[in-house]
Amino acid sequence: MTDSTYDVTRVRTYLQGLQTRIADALGALDGTPLATDTWQRGPAERLRGGGCTRILEGGRVFERAGIGFSDVAGDALPPSASAARPQLAGRGFEALGVSLVLHPRNPYCPTVHMNVRMLIATKPGEAPVFWFGGGMDLTPVYGFEDDARHFHQTCKDALDPFGAELYPRFKQWCDEYFFLKHRNETRGIGGIFFDDFSEPGFERSFDLMQSVGDAFLHAYLPIVERRAELPYGERERDFQAYRRGRYVEFNLVFDRGTLFGLQSGGRTESILMSMPPVANWRYNWQPEPDSPEARLYSDFLVPRDWV
């Protein structure tokens, strides 16, 4: 967080363009265009503003793909946003960002999440305070080391122009953030995560956010192209549904974006579009020793240096 010099219009224009570019690329890959759901909140509602949700369900490649843009404002930062910044509690805010979660149909094709956002906290008589956040992370059902290395290398390449120290810092942040404490396991193989970022000022921070957003298709599409047509059976789909249960647990219990949206009176359909279309839970299930399912736990659901 830093001084009050910023340009929301440029950020908004970039984010709307990013959503369109990603939606067009995913629609072309799947063969099904993503539907558009534009929404607006009235000036008297708890949360003002609006957004656009691009959504695909039941596609050839993607069982569910959701990309949301929102630009909303409220009278008081919700607890999930001000807990680490008590000096900002009670301030008004504007939050704008793009968030996506893609759940492929093929169990060999990993789920992915990406988010880039800007928040501005305001208080009459005081300078506004802004910061950026975002990142991307990969959640495989069946792990492939080539995919993990490619994803992390692309993340590193996006950050390196802004300082060689940022990738290891944001990678560790991601490993620690996307962790299910009650399961004692990571959600996936991580990636990068950052929040409260404005150290270099608006221009450089905005450039970094754009670099992360622009890297997403390069990080993920080659993996989809390698894995989406691999043959699979009922066993793999069953394990996929089981692992998706972990995704649900994290998003509803720990995810700050989900909590921010629900606590601030956000649009529930857009907030919960990250949920997988099918998930299941089993009592005390364990994978067979030395199986591909066991390898996910031993080789991938532990923090590793992938690059």
UniProtKB/Swiss-Prot annotation:
Gene3D superfamilies tied to this protein: Coproporphyrinogen III oxidase, aerobic
Pathway the protein contributes to: Porphyrin-containing compound metabolism; protoporphyrin-IX biosynthesis; protoporphyrinogen-IX from coproporphyrinogen-III (O2 route): step 1/1
GO biological process: protoporphyrinogen IX biosynthetic process
Residues that bind a divalent metal cation: H103, H113, H152, H182
Keywords, comma-separated and alphabetical: Cytoplasm, Heme biosynthesis, Metal-binding, Oxidoreductase, Porphyrin biosynthesis
List of catalytic residues: H113
EC number: 1.3.3.3
Site keyed Important for dimerization: positions: H182
Record's subcellular location: Cytoplasm
One GO CC term on file: cytoplasm
Catalytic activity: coproporphyrinogen III + O2 + 2 H(+) = protoporphyrinogen IX + 2 CO2 + 2 H2O
Main subcellular localisation: cytoplasm
Example of a GO MF term: coproporphyrinogen oxidase activity
UniProt binding sites for substrate: S99, N115, V116, R117, G265, G266, R267
Source superkingdom: Bacteria
PANTHER family (UniProt xref): COPROPORPHYRINOGEN III OXIDASE, MITOCHONDRIAL, OXYGEN-DEPENDENT COPROPORPHYRINOGEN-III OXIDASE, MITOCHONDRIAL
Record text on subunit structure and interactions: Homodimer.
Record family assignment: Belongs to the aerobic coproporphyrinogen-III oxidase family.
Function: Involved in the heme biosynthesis. Catalyzes the aerobic oxidative decarboxylation of propionate groups of rings A and B of coproporphyrinogen-III to yield the vinyl groups in protoporphyrinogen-IX.
Protein name: Oxygen-dependent coproporphyrinogen-III oxidase
Species this protein is from: Burkholderia orbicola (strain MC0-3)
Upper classification of the organism: Bacteria, Pseudomonadati, Pseudomonadota, Betaproteobacteria, Burkholderiales
